[in-house]
């Protein structure tokens, strides 16, 4: 959070309102139905300016958001989401005098428009999508450790495919063997991708004629995919 606050300050942005589920998980520790306000370093609402610092406004579940953020050891405030027409006033009482930036490159326009209107008394909301990406692209030591651990799981997935593979085994059966390893290690089953409208499966195995069929996915692997026929 301090690093992000510094990046906001360097970009000349007073603060950020984060709402993309993946980024809520990264900055707040969970992905409840919420919006997280992070003030720029030294800007209104920041601790340096006499404010209370970052705050997570939660619609539901407040109790789970507190738990996921560390409960009594939470590095930010966790509050009930106020009424939208009172949102700018709530932020103003926290010392915020300029509209925070929104993730226009991530969330649907109809969703962001609601916040643009609600925050309009504080001014125009800039786009902070690139600032978020700038921090997320630099992986922490912990993230690097998790990537190495994930690579070990991936290796065991390949070994599972090798163990069950043979004549007459379908591509879906091979994928199931690989994903069984992934799920047993705690994978939730979904890979979130920022680029709309891409989606990604944990395992894709293609062979024969199916292997030569292209798809919309930005990858060398296509295939027919699962279908009723």
Question: Where is each model-derived feature located?
Answer:
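A composition/biophysics-driven feature that prefers long, compositionally simple stretches
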Residues: 1-157, 171
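Short catalytic-site patches enriched in acidic/histidine residues
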Residues: 27-32, 129-132, 138, 171-229
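Generic secondary-structure signature for well-ordered alpha-helical cores
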Residues: 120, 149-159, 163-170, 179-188
């Amino acid at each position: 959070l301090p690093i992000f606050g510094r990046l906001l300050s360097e970009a000349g942005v007073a603060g950020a309102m984060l709402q993309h589920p993946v980024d809520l998980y990264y900055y707040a520790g969970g992905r409840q139905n919420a919006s997280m306000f992070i003030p720029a370093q030294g800007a209104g609402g920041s601790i340096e300016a006499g404010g209370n610092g970052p705050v997570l406004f939660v619609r539901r579940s407040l109790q789970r958001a507190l738990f996921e953020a560390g409960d009594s050891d939470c590095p930010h405030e966790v509050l009930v989401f106020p009424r939208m027409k009172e949102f700018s006033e709530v932020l103003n009482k926290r010392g915020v005098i300029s509209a925070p930036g929104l993730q226009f490159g991530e969330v649907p326009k109809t969703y962001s428009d609601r916040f643009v209107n609600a925050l309009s008394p504080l001014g125009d909301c800039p786009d902070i999508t690139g600032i978020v990406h700038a921090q997320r692209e630099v992986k922490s030591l912990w993230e690097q450790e998790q990537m190495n651990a994930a690579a070990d799981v991936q290796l065991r997935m390949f070994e599972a495919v090798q163990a069950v593979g043979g004549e007459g085994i379908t591509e879906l059966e091979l994928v199931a063997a690989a994903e069984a390893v992934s799920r047993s290690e705690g994978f939730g089953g979904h890979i979130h991708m920022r680029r709309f409208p891409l989606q990604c499966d944990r395992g894709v195995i293609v062979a024969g004629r199916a292997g030569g069929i292209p798809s919309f996915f930005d990858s060398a692997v296509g295939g027919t995919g699962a279908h009723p026929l």
